[in-house]
Design a protein with these regions (language model features):
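Membrane-associated alpha-helical segments
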Residues: 136-236, 242-244
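Extended alpha-helical interaction modules
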Residues: 2-143
Length: 247
Protein backbone atom coordinates (compact mmCIF):
# COMPACT_ATOMS: atom_id res chain seq x y z
CA UNK A 1 0.00 0.00 0.00
CA UNK A 2 1.39 3.41 -0.99
CA UNK A 3 -1.38 5.90 -0.29
CA UNK A 4 -2.16 7.99 1.64
CA UNK A 5 1.13 6.83 3.17
CA UNK A 6 3.35 3.77 2.57
CA UNK A 7 2.33 0.72 4.59
CA UNK A 8 2.53 -3.06 4.66
CA UNK A 9 -0.39 -5.35 5.49
CA UNK A 10 0.86 -8.03 7.88
CA UNK A 11 -0.95 -11.20 8.95
CA UNK A 12 -0.20 -10.81 12.64
CA UNK A 13 -1.92 -13.96 13.90
CA UNK A 14 -3.83 -16.91 12.49
CA UNK A 15 -5.93 -19.05 14.83
CA UNK A 16 -8.27 -21.98 14.15
CA UNK A 17 -11.45 -21.33 16.12
CA UNK A 18 -13.79 -23.95 17.52
CA UNK A 19 -17.48 -23.24 18.06
CA UNK A 20 -16.96 -22.76 21.79
CA UNK A 21 -13.85 -20.59 21.37
CA UNK A 22 -13.67 -17.07 22.75
CA UNK A 23 -13.98 -14.58 19.89
CA UNK A 24 -11.43 -11.76 19.52
CA UNK A 25 -12.10 -8.39 21.08
CA UNK A 26 -12.24 -4.98 19.41
CA UNK A 27 -9.36 -4.20 17.05
CA UNK A 28 -6.90 -1.41 17.72
CA UNK A 29 -6.18 1.34 15.18
CA UNK A 30 -5.19 0.05 11.72
CA UNK A 31 -6.00 -3.53 12.77
CA UNK A 32 -8.60 -5.73 11.09
CA UNK A 33 -10.02 -8.84 12.77
CA UNK A 34 -11.32 -11.30 10.16
CA UNK A 35 -13.13 -14.60 10.75
CA UNK A 36 -13.57 -17.12 7.92
CA UNK A 37 -16.26 -19.78 8.25
CA UNK A 38 -17.12 -22.57 5.82
CA UNK A 39 -20.37 -22.23 3.92
CA UNK A 40 -23.18 -24.76 3.97
CA UNK A 41 -23.73 -27.45 6.57
CA UNK A 42 -20.10 -27.32 7.71
CA UNK A 43 -20.98 -24.27 9.82
CA UNK A 44 -23.79 -24.88 12.31
CA UNK A 45 -26.68 -22.47 12.73
CA UNK A 46 -25.81 -21.61 16.34
CA UNK A 47 -22.16 -20.92 15.45
CA UNK A 48 -23.23 -18.74 12.53
CA UNK A 49 -25.57 -16.76 14.77
CA UNK A 50 -22.77 -16.26 17.27
CA UNK A 51 -20.46 -14.97 14.54
CA UNK A 52 -23.13 -12.57 13.30
CA UNK A 53 -23.67 -11.31 16.85
CA UNK A 54 -19.89 -10.76 17.11
CA UNK A 55 -20.07 -8.63 13.98
CA UNK A 56 -22.98 -6.58 15.34
CA UNK A 57 -21.44 -5.99 18.78
CA UNK A 58 -20.65 -2.34 19.37
CA UNK A 59 -21.95 -1.08 16.03
CA UNK A 60 -23.82 2.23 15.79
CA UNK A 61 -25.47 4.40 13.15
CA UNK A 62 -22.15 5.84 12.02
CA UNK A 63 -20.48 2.42 11.70
CA UNK A 64 -23.12 -0.13 10.65
CA UNK A 65 -22.26 -3.62 9.47
CA UNK A 66 -22.17 -3.83 5.67
CA UNK A 67 -22.98 -7.03 3.79
CA UNK A 68 -21.68 -7.70 0.28
CA UNK A 69 -22.07 -10.96 -1.69
CA UNK A 70 -18.99 -12.14 -3.60
CA UNK A 71 -19.53 -15.13 -5.93
CA UNK A 72 -21.27 -17.27 -3.35
CA UNK A 73 -19.42 -15.93 -0.33
CA UNK A 74 -21.21 -13.88 2.26
CA UNK A 75 -19.01 -10.99 3.38
CA UNK A 76 -19.83 -8.76 6.35
CA UNK A 77 -17.62 -5.80 7.19
CA UNK A 78 -17.48 -2.87 9.55
CA UNK A 79 -14.52 -0.84 10.84
CA UNK A 80 -12.11 -3.13 12.66
CA UNK A 81 -13.69 -6.50 11.86
CA UNK A 82 -15.05 -8.69 9.07
CA UNK A 83 -16.79 -12.04 8.66
CA UNK A 84 -16.60 -14.22 5.54
CA UNK A 85 -18.81 -17.29 5.15
CA UNK A 86 -17.88 -19.22 2.04
CA UNK A 87 -15.21 -21.19 0.21
CA UNK A 88 -11.97 -21.43 2.24
CA UNK A 89 -9.97 -21.53 -1.01
CA UNK A 90 -10.82 -17.87 -1.57
CA UNK A 91 -9.66 -16.88 1.89
CA UNK A 92 -6.40 -15.24 0.79
CA UNK A 93 -7.78 -13.09 -2.03
CA UNK A 94 -10.77 -11.94 0.01
CA UNK A 95 -8.50 -11.12 2.94
CA UNK A 96 -6.35 -8.98 0.64
CA UNK A 97 -9.38 -7.06 -0.65
CA UNK A 98 -10.78 -6.51 2.84
CA UNK A 99 -7.41 -5.32 4.16
CA UNK A 100 -6.98 -2.81 1.32
CA UNK A 101 -10.52 -1.45 1.67
CA UNK A 102 -10.23 -1.23 5.46
CA UNK A 103 -6.94 0.69 5.14
CA UNK A 104 -8.36 3.31 2.78
CA UNK A 105 -11.76 3.62 4.48
CA UNK A 106 -10.01 3.94 7.84
CA UNK A 107 -7.97 6.89 6.60
CA UNK A 108 -11.13 8.48 5.20
CA UNK A 109 -12.81 8.07 8.59
CA UNK A 110 -9.77 9.54 10.33
CA UNK A 111 -9.80 12.62 8.09
CA UNK A 112 -13.54 13.00 8.68
CA UNK A 113 -13.00 12.92 12.43
CA UNK A 114 -10.11 15.38 12.41
CA UNK A 115 -11.89 17.93 10.21
CA UNK A 116 -15.12 17.59 12.19
CA UNK A 117 -13.21 18.27 15.42
CA UNK A 118 -11.65 21.38 13.83
CA UNK A 119 -15.01 22.81 12.77
CA UNK A 120 -16.14 24.37 16.07
CA UNK A 121 -12.75 25.99 16.88
CA UNK A 122 -12.70 27.35 13.34
CA UNK A 123 -15.92 29.26 14.00
CA UNK A 124 -14.11 31.20 16.73
CA UNK A 125 -11.35 32.03 14.23
CA UNK A 126 -13.69 33.58 11.65
CA UNK A 127 -13.12 37.00 13.23
CA UNK A 128 -9.48 36.79 12.14
CA UNK A 129 -10.59 37.09 8.51
CA UNK A 130 -11.88 40.62 9.22
CA UNK A 131 -9.78 43.65 10.13
CA UNK A 132 -7.75 42.24 13.04
CA UNK A 133 -6.80 44.03 16.22
CA UNK A 134 -3.49 44.02 18.04
CA UNK A 135 -4.54 41.15 20.33
CA UNK A 136 -5.09 38.95 17.27
CA UNK A 137 -1.35 38.86 16.61
CA UNK A 138 -1.00 36.51 19.58
CA UNK A 139 -2.91 33.91 17.53
CA UNK A 140 -0.47 34.02 14.63
CA UNK A 141 1.23 30.76 15.66
CA UNK A 142 -2.14 29.01 15.95
CA UNK A 143 -3.14 30.20 12.47
CA UNK A 144 0.18 29.05 11.02
CA UNK A 145 -0.35 25.58 12.53
CA UNK A 146 -3.83 25.39 11.05
CA UNK A 147 -2.61 26.44 7.62
CA UNK A 148 -0.09 23.61 7.72
CA UNK A 149 -2.66 21.17 9.08
CA UNK A 150 -5.28 21.92 6.43
CA UNK A 151 -2.63 21.63 3.72
CA UNK A 152 -1.69 18.17 5.00
CA UNK A 153 -5.38 17.22 4.98
CA UNK A 154 -5.66 18.33 1.36
CA UNK A 155 -2.58 16.31 0.39
CA UNK A 156 -3.89 13.20 2.19
CA UNK A 157 -7.28 13.64 0.54
CA UNK A 158 -5.73 13.89 -2.94
CA UNK A 159 -3.77 10.68 -2.41
CA UNK A 160 -6.76 8.85 -0.92
CA UNK A 161 -9.58 9.86 -3.28
CA UNK A 162 -8.53 7.83 -6.33
CA UNK A 163 -8.18 4.61 -4.30
CA UNK A 164 -11.67 4.91 -2.85
CA UNK A 165 -13.39 5.96 -6.08
CA UNK A 166 -11.76 3.09 -7.99
CA UNK A 167 -10.44 -0.26 -6.66
CA UNK A 168 -6.65 -0.75 -6.75
CA UNK A 169 -5.42 -2.58 -9.84
CA UNK A 170 -3.56 -5.24 -7.86
CA UNK A 171 -6.89 -6.81 -6.83
CA UNK A 172 -8.41 -9.43 -9.12
CA UNK A 173 -11.77 -8.91 -10.83
CA UNK A 174 -13.99 -10.63 -8.27
CA UNK A 175 -12.36 -8.86 -5.33
CA UNK A 176 -12.53 -5.53 -7.17
CA UNK A 177 -16.30 -6.01 -7.41
CA UNK A 178 -16.42 -6.73 -3.68
CA UNK A 179 -14.36 -3.57 -3.06
CA UNK A 180 -16.79 -1.53 -5.19
CA UNK A 181 -19.80 -2.98 -3.37
CA UNK A 182 -18.35 -2.13 0.05
CA UNK A 183 -17.44 1.38 -1.12
CA UNK A 184 -20.98 1.92 -2.43
CA UNK A 185 -22.61 0.69 0.78
CA UNK A 186 -20.22 2.78 2.89
CA UNK A 187 -21.33 5.83 0.83
CA UNK A 188 -17.71 6.61 0.08
CA UNK A 189 -18.48 8.92 -2.86
CA UNK A 190 -20.77 11.20 -0.83
CA UNK A 191 -18.39 11.17 2.13
CA UNK A 192 -15.49 12.20 -0.09
CA UNK A 193 -17.52 15.09 -1.50
CA UNK A 194 -18.46 16.28 1.99
CA UNK A 195 -14.87 15.98 3.20
CA UNK A 196 -13.62 17.89 0.16
CA UNK A 197 -15.99 20.78 0.91
CA UNK A 198 -15.03 20.83 4.57
CA UNK A 199 -11.29 20.91 3.86
CA UNK A 200 -11.79 23.66 1.28
CA UNK A 201 -13.69 25.85 3.76
CA UNK A 202 -11.07 25.35 6.48
CA UNK A 203 -8.22 26.00 4.06
CA UNK A 204 -9.80 29.21 2.78
CA UNK A 205 -10.51 30.38 6.32
CA UNK A 206 -6.98 29.98 7.65
CA UNK A 207 -5.23 31.17 4.50
CA UNK A 208 -7.33 34.34 4.60
CA UNK A 209 -6.67 34.73 8.34
CA UNK A 210 -2.92 34.36 7.71
CA UNK A 211 -3.10 37.02 4.98
CA UNK A 212 -5.02 39.42 7.23
CA UNK A 213 -2.59 38.99 10.12
CA UNK A 214 0.36 39.42 7.77
CA UNK A 215 -1.12 42.60 6.33
CA UNK A 216 -1.83 43.95 9.83
CA UNK A 217 1.68 43.14 11.02
CA UNK A 218 3.12 44.90 7.95
CA UNK A 219 0.82 47.90 8.52
CA UNK A 220 1.97 48.18 12.14
CA UNK A 221 5.60 48.00 11.05
CA UNK A 222 5.08 50.69 8.42
CA UNK A 223 3.21 52.84 10.95
CA UNK A 224 6.13 52.60 13.39
CA UNK A 225 8.56 53.70 10.67
CA UNK A 226 6.33 56.64 9.72
CA UNK A 227 6.01 57.75 13.36
CA UNK A 228 9.78 57.45 13.73
CA UNK A 229 10.26 59.68 10.67
CA UNK A 230 7.78 62.21 12.08
CA UNK A 231 9.64 62.17 15.42
CA UNK A 232 12.98 62.76 13.67
CA UNK A 233 11.53 65.62 11.62
CA UNK A 234 10.05 67.20 14.75
CA UNK A 235 13.39 66.85 16.51
CA UNK A 236 15.20 68.49 13.59
CA UNK A 237 12.62 71.28 13.51
CA UNK A 238 13.04 71.81 17.24
CA UNK A 239 16.84 71.97 16.93
CA UNK A 240 16.54 74.45 14.08
CA UNK A 241 14.21 76.67 16.11
CA UNK A 242 16.53 76.45 19.11
CA UNK A 243 19.54 77.50 17.00
CA UNK A 244 17.53 80.33 15.45
CA UNK A 245 16.42 81.53 18.88
CA UNK A 246 20.00 81.54 20.18
CA UNK A 247 21.19 83.66 17.25
Amino acid sequence: LRDPQPALAVLAQRIELSEDAELPETAVDDELLVIFANAGLQTGHAWRQRLEAWMAAGEDERQPTLEAPSFGERVLWRPGRALVIGNPERCRELLEGLAVFAWHEGHLRRLEGETAAAWEPAQADVELTQLPRRAALRRQEHVNRQVRRTTLWRMAYARLESHLEKPPLQLNGAVRRLYNELAMQAEVHDRLATLDDRIEVLQDLYELAADRLGEYRYFRGELRVEWLIVAILLLEAGLSLWELWNH
